[in-house]
């Protein structure tokens, strides 16, 4: 009887050990990280550097697959339909989960079909005055916009972008009306901003850095978790008592829903080690990116809150996709 009990215990221990081993990420399969944007942008750079570090640290075969289309919805849907075995991951900003589904029908339910794993980087958004707007600071902008409703034209990378939704939230919070001018990307907005066609630019901060340095543009505030090292004098919107308008591109890793807790924890641990790696930290510094905003439930809660608040802002302002 004792022999049978010991044998059963041994078999159980072996089974448990096998199960625990199966929970380790990355496992035997190659890992495909889908980036739902064209090559060359911030997400692509983050994905490739993160992939390089993960290869070195875990021995995994990491493949970066750019799959743009449908406002980043195409690549996002591919991951949402994948098996939750850790072999297919999404690297994207939170926008395909928290903004896009409120603008158009998607084939995935962002709150049901995808699991936030970790925020890996933040791309700050800058609110910058052009030569066409004579104000000294953010308070001056709001005062002018209140006294001259719709007179201030602000250029963004496009309708339904983080910058657009963030400015809608800002205008609602400050009762300052301004006119949105959507462009097709940061570069087009910058060109018109430098030419004085618009009074204000709301674009990724790295796009305007040289023009701020030359004096052609003046930063009034940043949408970011913390101040930019290159602009230590420029406040964040949270510091200006406008946390509800604190919008920025929060890049994260997402997995198909249904991943086991053990596998999720193993993946999160691998990502945390990779983000602490000097090579990855070097990319953040040189690209003027900030560290991610959280891992696991911390990040998941942020995504849920964004999804809910964006639904209200987009509906209240009748924001449409391009």
Give the location of each predicted region.
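Positively charged n-region of N-terminal signal peptides that target proteins for export
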Residues: 1-5
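Bacterial N-terminal signal peptides
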Residues: 8-17
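N-terminal (or domain-start) structured segment
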Residues: 22-112, 151, 175-200, 211, ...
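An extracytoplasmic/periplasmic, membrane-proximal ligand-sensing/linker region
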Residues: 27-30, 239, 261-322
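Hinge/capping helix and adjacent helix->loop/strand transition within the periplasmic-binding protein
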Residues: 81-87, 94, 101-188, 237, ...
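A ligand-binding cleft/hinge motif common to bilobed small-molecule-binding domains
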Residues: 95-105, 169-173, 200-234
């Amino acid at each position: 009887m004792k022999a049978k009990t010991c044998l059963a215990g041994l078999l159980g221990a072996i089974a448990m050990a096998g199960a625990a081993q199966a929970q380790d990420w990355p496992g035997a399969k190659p890992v495909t990280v889908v980036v739902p944007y064209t090559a060359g942008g911030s997400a692509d750079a983050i994905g490739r550097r993160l992939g390089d570090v993960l290869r070195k640290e875990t021995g995994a075969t990491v493949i970066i697959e750019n799959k743009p289309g449908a406002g980043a919805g195409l690549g996002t849907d591919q991951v949402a339909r994948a098996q939750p075995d850790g072999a297919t991951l999404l690297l994207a900003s939170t926008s395909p989960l928290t903004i896009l589904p409120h603008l158009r029908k998607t084939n995935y339910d962002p709150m049901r079909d995808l699991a936030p794993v970790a925020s890996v980087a933040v791309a700050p958004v800058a609110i910058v005055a052009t030569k066409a707007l004579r104000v000294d600071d953010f308070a001056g902008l709001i005062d002018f916009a209140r006294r001259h409703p719709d007179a201030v034209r602000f250029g963004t990378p496009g309708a339904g972008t983080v910058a657009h939704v963030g400015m809608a939230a800002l205008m609602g919070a400050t009762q300052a009306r301004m006119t949105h001018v959507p462009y097709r990307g940061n570069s087009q907005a910058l060109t018109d901003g430098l030419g004085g066609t618009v009074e204000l630019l709301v674009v990724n901060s790295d796009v305007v850095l040289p023009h701020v340095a030359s004096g052609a543009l003046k930063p009034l505030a940043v949408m970011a978790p913390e101040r930019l090292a290159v602009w230590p004098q420029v406040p964040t919107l949270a510091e200006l008592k406008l946390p509800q308008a604190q919008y920025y591109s929060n890049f994260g890793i997402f997995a198909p829903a249904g991943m086991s807790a053990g596998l999720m924890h193993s993946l999160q641990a691998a990502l945390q080690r990779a983000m602490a790696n000097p090579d990855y930290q070097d990319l953040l510094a040189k690209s003027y990116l900030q560290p991610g905003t959280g891992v696991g439930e911390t990040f998941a809660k942020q995504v849920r809150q964004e999804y809910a608040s964006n639904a209200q802002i987009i509906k209240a302002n009748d924001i449409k996709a391009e």
